[in-house]
Amino acid sequence: MKWENRKQEMQKMNKNILVVLFLLVFAGANAQENLVKLQKSKTDSIKLYLKEALDLMRKRSVNSSKLKWEEIYKNANEAAENAKTIADTYPIIKNTLLKLGDSHSKFFSPKQVEAYLLGYRKTGQQFPVMKSAILEGGYAYVQLPSFASFNFTEWDEYVKTFWHKIAELESKHPKGWMIDLRDNEGGMFAPMYASISPFLNQSNVIGCKDGFGKYIFMNFKNGKFYENNLARYQFKLGGQKVKIGRMPIVILINQGTGSSGEFAAISFVGQKNISFVGTKTTGLTSANQEHKLADGAFLVLTEGNTVDRNKKEYAEVGKGLQPDYPIDNMGLLKSSDDAYLKKAIEVINKKLSTP
């Protein structure tokens, strides 16, 4: 009897072992299947990410029609075959941007974008300094520096600081103005445009022409920055307003004036009380638009060329804006401020003496 019981227990145990072994094999197979699915899903997401970036370039780049896209997709996908993460596609995207040939399209990783969103102070950087002064003889001088922040609180601060400075200078009743755009390498144009708006005599002074021939003009009114009739951003300026008298204005430019710095300069082209003193600008006069990708990276594409109030197109990379009154051999250096300021004063006095 005991032997029979022992035998039954052994048979039951063997069955249990078989069940456990089956479950382990099944679980192992299931885990392997899930791993394969996960790897496939990861591979698919990498491919989709790269495709999204390439699709944006093909659809939005101003030079899209000049490129062999079938070949570009093929080469990019081949380069991404061994990509293990989305970050592995960044060099491929950057390499493709170079093929666009506009010298202005860029890629910003999520980490770089995060720094732009945090702004200057939260990343341990100094907020751009705006120099201003009433020069001997009663001439107002103000500097508009580069501005590379996507922090909207800092956008407001940038404009309010500039407006405070020009309001203070205007209260001194200057004979004329010098707006210094030298070495303004660009950054965010909306706050720059809002800053200089009190000096502009009309709307539709700066815009772009896209690859389909459509014009888009930027404007600033009642604290809002517009693209055509679409309000893109509402500045919080606390009701602050500035009015500048119509008098001679000299815009100081050099080879370090680029991108949004050039757009600011071009905003004044064709305005009668404006003169340009310095050297030619950088020549990055294309219009860019940022696109947020799935992981938070920014793909910034050149989608058009800058146009002035007369719809003159600034399409040639490197040509830049030419000064009315050249200062020879200054390049990027501002060590010869005396030469710039002396010429600016001379131009202002000439304008004042001309009926």
Which residue stretches match the model-derived regions?
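Short, well-ordered loop/turn elements at secondary-structure boundaries
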Residues: 13, 136, 245-246
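Bacterial Sec-dependent N-terminal signal peptides
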Residues: 1-36
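Short alpha-helical "patches" and their helix-cap loops
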Residues: 16-17, 71-74, 209-214
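Short regulatory "switch" loops immediately downstream of catalytic or recognition motifs
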Residues: 1, 147-149, 306
